[in-house]
C-alpha cells in the first residue's frame, strides 16, 4: 500500500511465527497434500500465508485452490471496502494478523485488538466506482458504468484480486443502479440519443453472469419517463424495485407482463441512504447513530437492539457503510484523528454483528468484534462495502 495512505508508525520487534526450516519441510510434502491443507486456511490469513514463499503466492490465486475449497466445503465470505478521493479510487479487503510472540506491552495492546486490518487490492483505475454501480455475484465484484456516461463493465475476481473487462452495456449510461437476483444483474440508467442531445431516455438491461451476455431483447421503458434519473434499486421478495430521486413512490418491474407497476413501501427514501445493505429480505441502514432495520413483509421499521458495546457510530450515513458478511452485518465507520488540532487523517473502524430475530418485531445484535482497520487521509470518503464468496 502506498505510504500516502498511512501516517508514520513506530516499528515493533516481532518474532517470526515459523522458521525457514519449517517452511522448507512443509513444501517437501506432496503437492496434493499441500493443496488440501492450504484450502482449509481461512481467507483472512491468505495474505500472511503468501509471505512464506513465491510458490505459496502462486498457489493462493490458482483455480485449483478454489476448486479444492469448493469441493471440501471451505468456501467463505470475503469482505471488501471501496473508498474514494476523486479522481482516486481504492479497494481493500479484510485480513487478519496471525498470532505472534509478543512482548509484555504488546500483550496489553493485543487485548484491545482482534488483529483485523484492511489490505489493499489492485485499484479500479480504468473506471470510477460508485455505490449503486458495484454489485457482487459469487466470487466476482462487478463495476458497471458509474455516474458518467459509460458502457464499460469491469470485474474484480476476488480469488486472485485481479480486474478484467466484461461485455459492455448496449449504450453509454449515466445514473446507473444495479441489483442482483439468481446470478443475473439488473441494470437501470439513462442515455442520450446522441452526444449533443440534452434529453435522456430510461434504459433497462439484464446481464446473465453465467453466459456473460446481455439480454438481446430490449426491456420496455415507455412507462418510466425520467424515473431512472439518480435512482436506486433493490430486490425485495423477488421484485425488482426502482426508487427515482425526483419522483415519489417506487416502481417494480412485472416480468410476466413486461411492464412497470407502482408499489407501496415505507422503505422508499431509505434506498438513498448509501449505508444500507440487505440480508434475507430485511434492509439494514445506519441512521442517527443507530442501526435500523426494515421488513417489507411487515411494512415496518425498528432499531437493532443490544449494540451498546459498539457505542455511538457517526450520525451521517456518509460516514458509515454496512454489508452482508456471512449473514451478519459488517459495519465500517470512520473517526477523525486529531493532529495538532488539524484533522488530516481518519481512522476506519470495522465491526461484525451477529443477528438474532427474537420476535417478528424485534431484532437483536451481538458485537462479535470491532477493530481499527485502516488509517487514511481525511479527504477520502466511503464508496461501498460488499462481500464476495471465495
UniProtKB/Swiss-Prot annotation:
<dbReference type="InterPro" id="IPR050354">
    <property type="entry name" value="F-box/kelch-repeat_ARATH"/>
</dbReference>
<feature type="domain" description="F-box">
    <location>
        <begin position="23"/>
        <end position="69"/>
    </location>
</feature>
<keyword id="KW-0880">Kelch repeat</keyword>
<dbReference type="InterPro" id="IPR015915">
    <property type="entry name" value="Kelch-typ_b-propeller"/>
</dbReference>
<feature type="repeat" description="Kelch 1">
    <location>
        <begin position="140"/>
        <end position="183"/>
    </location>
</feature>
<dbReference type="InterPro" id="IPR001810">
    <property type="entry name" value="F-box_dom"/>
</dbReference>
<dbReference type="Pfam" id="PF25210">
    <property type="entry name" value="Kelch_FKB95"/>
</dbReference>
<feature type="repeat" description="Kelch 2">
    <location>
        <begin position="185"/>
        <end position="234"/>
    </location>
</feature>
<feature type="repeat" description="Kelch 3">
    <location>
        <begin position="236"/>
        <end position="281"/>
    </location>
</feature>
<dbReference type="Pfam" id="PF00646">
    <property type="entry name" value="F-box"/>
</dbReference>
<dbReference type="InterPro" id="IPR036047">
    <property type="entry name" value="F-box-like_dom_sf"/>
</dbReference>
<keyword id="KW-0677">Repeat</keyword>
<protein>
    <recommendedName>
        <fullName>F-box/kelch-repeat protein At3g06570</fullName>
    </recommendedName>
</protein>
Amino acid at each position: 500500500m502506498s505510504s500516502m495512505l498511512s501516517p508514520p508508525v513506530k516499528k515493533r520487534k516481532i518474532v517470526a511465527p515459523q522458521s525457514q526450516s519449517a517452511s522448507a519441510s512443509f513444501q517437501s510434502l506432496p503437492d496434493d497434500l499441500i493443496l488440501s491443507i492450504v484450502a482449509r486456511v481461512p481467507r483472512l490469513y491468505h495474505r500472511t500465508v503468501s509471505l512464506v514463499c513465491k510458490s505459496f503466492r502462486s498457489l493462493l490465486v490458482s483455480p485449483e485452490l478454489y476448486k479444492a475449497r469448493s469441493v471440501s466445503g471451505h468456501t467463505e465470505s470475503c469482505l471488501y471496502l471501496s473508498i474514494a478521493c476523486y479522481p482516486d479510487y481504492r479497494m481493500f479487503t479484510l485480513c487478519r494478523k496471525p498470532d505472534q510472540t509478543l512482548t509484555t506491552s504488546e500483550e496489553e495492546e493485543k487485548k484491545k485488538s482482534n488483529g483485523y486490518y484492511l489490505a489493499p487490492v489492485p485499484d479500479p483505475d480504468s473506471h470510477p466506482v460508485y455505490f449503486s454501480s458495484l454489485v457482487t455475484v459469487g466470487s466476482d465484484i462487478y463495476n458497471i458504468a458509474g455516474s458518467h456516461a459509460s458502457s464499460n463493465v469491469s470485474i474484480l475476481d476476488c480469488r486472485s484480486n485481479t480486474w478484467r473487462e466484461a461485455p459492455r452495456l448496449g449504450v453509454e449510461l449515466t445514473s446507473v443502479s444495479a441489483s442482483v437476483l439468481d446470478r443475473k444483474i439488473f441494470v437501470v440508467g439513462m442515455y442520450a440519443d446522441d452526444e449533443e442531445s440534452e434529453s435522456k431516455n430510461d434504459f433497462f438491461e439484464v446481464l446473465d453472469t453465467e453466459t456473460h451476455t446481455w439480454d438481446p431483447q430490449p426491456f420496455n421503458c415507455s412507462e418510466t419517463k425520467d424515473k431512472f434519473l439518480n435512482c436506486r434499486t433493490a430486490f425485495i421478495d423477488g421484485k425488482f424495485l426502482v426508487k427515482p430521486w425526483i419522483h415519489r413512490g417506487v416502481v417494480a418491474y412485472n416480468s410476466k407482463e413486461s411492464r412497470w407497476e407502482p408499489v407501496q413501501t415505507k422503505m422508499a427514501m431509505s434506498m438513498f441512504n448509501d449505508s444500507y445493505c440487505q440480508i434475507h429480505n430485511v434492509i439494514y441502514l445506519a441512521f442517527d447513530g443507530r442501526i435500523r432495520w426494515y421488513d417489507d413483509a411487515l411494512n415496518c421499521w425498528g432499531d437493532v437492539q443490544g449494540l451498546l458495546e459498539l457505542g455511538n457510530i457517526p450520525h451521517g450515513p456518509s460516514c458509515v457503510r454496512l454489508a452482508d458478511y456471512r449473514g451478519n452485518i459488517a459495519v465500517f465507520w470512520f473517526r477523525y484523528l486529531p493532529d495538532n488540532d488539524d484533522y488530516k487523517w481518519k481512522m476506519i473502524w470495522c465491526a461484525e454483528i451477529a443477528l438474532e430475530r427474537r420476535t417478528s418485531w424485534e431484532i437483536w445484535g451481538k458485537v462479535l468484534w470491532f477493530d481499527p482497520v485502516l488509517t487514511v487521509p481525511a479527504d477520502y470518503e466511503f464508496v461501498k462495502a460488499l462481500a464476495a464468496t471465495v
